[in-house]
């Protein structure tokens, strides 16, 4: 692993240097070779295990925790920072550099009286969701590995510590900019320093001047809108959309009590700490804009207000455009021109179908997958049998067929639907079963689940049971932020 230290060397006021404590009896629990290839690691090794567990120094590593602030559940927290994540530096690879971070490596100056550790269950969940989202083609940070230990840690009860090795194209968050705006820490000079660094590292085609700043913020708005459109189309609820959990690159970031939808429910809440549903599934598009507005506020000392507002006004446009692209793919709809009238018609058609799904309490993923078995030219649809409200479905299906038109190659059309409507997602109960098995010393369910998630659009008949609706105990599991 070849490391460079651009952030560490160029932004000394944006972090504190801190070294990992190490863990006892480190051992590999999970490994992603896909992620390893990004930074040219051929295979796991004992030497790498000792380095990534914090028990030995990694050549070229600087070890630091970044500082930032953020809006958490709508309220501003003036100092947050990496409370249990220690970054080694940026590892070089064929697709560019990736930050390497040890999540759960011990306390930092930003731990806020915490122990700086991560428990095994949260480490495994982050690993699995990183694999799942990547293979669903949704922008995300990656997880290289989970390292287990026999180190006890206390949450609600005694658990075992683990480390997630996270890879990110950048760890810069909306909250980094907020930290240097809402303080006496040298803004706007520090804001400009951070923004220029971000542009040079990740948007090298842009200039570090007023024109480049506006173009950059416009891209951040568009990338954030696309990320959230992906979430809404696939049925993913992040759970903790605080501004310190928002990547400046539009990557899904900082996983806690996330969930995929089981039964479709617009108001689904996956976070036990969010009883009012601020971050409910259906609220995510609006929260995305709210967070971008907080970022714009932080940038206002160095970017003209008119430029910020103009870029923010593109959020809804980009969100709808990308959402329609994804949902038309799921339904097999073609469009030759992006006319507003057609867009409005298709949004109404999509909304009518998701409304039917909710009223009939249908499984989100399985219902969309059924389009791969549908004969779109037939007057009677096998999909109809899933609905209790037959009249509602018939009315919708008639409108759908009119919009769809005649399909010449039904087999090809069905195959295309199966390439965008996954058969398998990371259901919370599947993750929980894998975690329980790990606690009992059995890694096979975890590794099988990882293999399943690497090919979510394939039939994988040996894992057929994992596509079924959850058992009663696993339906709509709500997780806590405890990790």
From Swiss-Prot:
Cofactor(s) of this protein: Mg(2+); Mn(2+)
Keywords linked to the UniProt accession: ATP-binding, Magnesium, Manganese, Metal-binding, Nucleotide-binding, Nucleotidyltransferase, Transferase
Catalyzed chemical reaction(s): L-seryl-[protein] + ATP = 3-O-(5'-adenylyl)-L-seryl-[protein] + diphosphate; L-threonyl-[protein] + ATP = 3-O-(5'-adenylyl)-L-threonyl-[protein] + diphosphate; L-tyrosyl-[protein] + ATP = O-(5'-adenylyl)-L-tyrosyl-[protein] + diphosphate; L-histidyl-[protein] + UTP = N(tele)-(5'-uridylyl)-L-histidyl-[protein] + diphosphate
Gene Ontology terms for molecular function: AMPylase activity; ATP binding; magnesium ion binding
Listed EC numbers: 2.7.7.-, 2.7.7.108
Residues forming the catalytic site: 244 (proton acceptor)
Binding positions (ATP): 81, 83-84, 103, 115-116, 166, 173, 254
Positions that bind Mg(2+): 245, 254
InterPro entries per record: SelO
Domain of life the protein comes from: Bacteria
Cited function: Nucleotidyltransferase involved in the post-translational modification of proteins. It can catalyze the addition of adenosine monophosphate (AMP) or uridine monophosphate (UMP) to a protein, resulting in modifications known as AMPylation and UMPylation.
UniProt family annotation: Belongs to the SELO family.
Name of the protein: Protein nucleotidyltransferase YdiU
Species the sequence originates in: Shewanella pealeana (strain ATCC 700345 / ANG-SQ1)
Encoding gene (name): ydiU
């Amino acid at each position: 692993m070849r490391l460079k230290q651009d952030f560490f060397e160029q932004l000394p006021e944006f972090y504190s240097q801190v070294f990992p404590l190490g863990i006892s009896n480190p051992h590999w629990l999970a490994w992603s070779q896909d992620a390893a290839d990004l930074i040219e690691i051929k295979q796991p090794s004992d030497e790498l295990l000792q380095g990534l567990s914090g028990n030995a120094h990694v050549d070229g590593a600087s070890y630091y925790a970044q500082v930032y602030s953020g809006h958490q559940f709508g309220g501003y927290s003036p100092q947050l920072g990496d409370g249990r994540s220690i970054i080694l530096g940026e590892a070089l690879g064929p697709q560019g550099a990736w930050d390497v971070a040890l999540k759960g490596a011990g306390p930092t100056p930003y731990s806020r009286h915490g122990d700086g550790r991560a428990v095994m269950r949260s480490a495994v969940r982050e690993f699995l969701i990183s694999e799942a989202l990547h293979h669903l083609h949704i922008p995300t940070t990656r997880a290289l590995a989970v390292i287990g230990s026999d180190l006890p840690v206390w949450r609600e009860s005694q658990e075992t510590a683990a480390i997630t090795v996270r890879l990110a194209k950048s760890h810069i968050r909306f909250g980094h900019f907020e930290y240097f705006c809402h303080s006496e820490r040298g803004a706007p000079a520090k804001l400009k320093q951070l923004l220029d660094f971000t542009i040079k590292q990740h948007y090298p085609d842009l200039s570090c001047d007023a024109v480049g700043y506006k173009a950059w913020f416009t891209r951040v708005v568009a990338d954030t809108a696309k990320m959230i459109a992906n979430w809404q189309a696939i049925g993913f609820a992040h759970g903790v959309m605080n501004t310190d959990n928002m990547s400046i690159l539009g990557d899904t970031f900082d996983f806690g009590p996330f969930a995929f939808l089981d039964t479709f429910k617009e108001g689904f809440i996956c976070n036990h700490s969010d009883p009012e549903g601020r971050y409910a599934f259906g609220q995510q598009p609006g929260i995305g804009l709210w967070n971008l507005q907080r970022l714009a506020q932080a940038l206002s000392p160095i970017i003209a207000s008119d430029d910020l507002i103009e870029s923010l006004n593109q959020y809804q446009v980009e969100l709808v455009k990308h959402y329609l692209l994804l949902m038309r793919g799921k339904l097999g709809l073609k469009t030759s021109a992006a006319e507003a009238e057609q867009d409005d018609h298709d949004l109404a058609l999509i909304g009518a179908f998701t409304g039917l799904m909710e009223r009939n309490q249908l499984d989100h993923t399985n219902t969309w997958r059924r389009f791969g078995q549908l004969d779109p030219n037939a007057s009677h649809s096998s999909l109809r049998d899933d609905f209790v409200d037959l009249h509602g479905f018939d009315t919708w299906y008639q409108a759908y067929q009119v919009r769809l038109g005649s399909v010449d190659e039904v087999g090809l059309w069905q195959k295309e639907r199966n390439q965008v409507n996954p058969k398998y997602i990371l259901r919370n109960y599947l993750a929980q079963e894998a975690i329980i098995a790990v606690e009992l010393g059995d890694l096979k369910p975890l590794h099988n689940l990882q293999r399943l998630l690497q090919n979510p659009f394939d039939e994988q008949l040996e894992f057929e049971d994992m596509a079924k609706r959850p058992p009663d105990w696993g339906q709509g599991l709500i997780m806590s932020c405890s990790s």
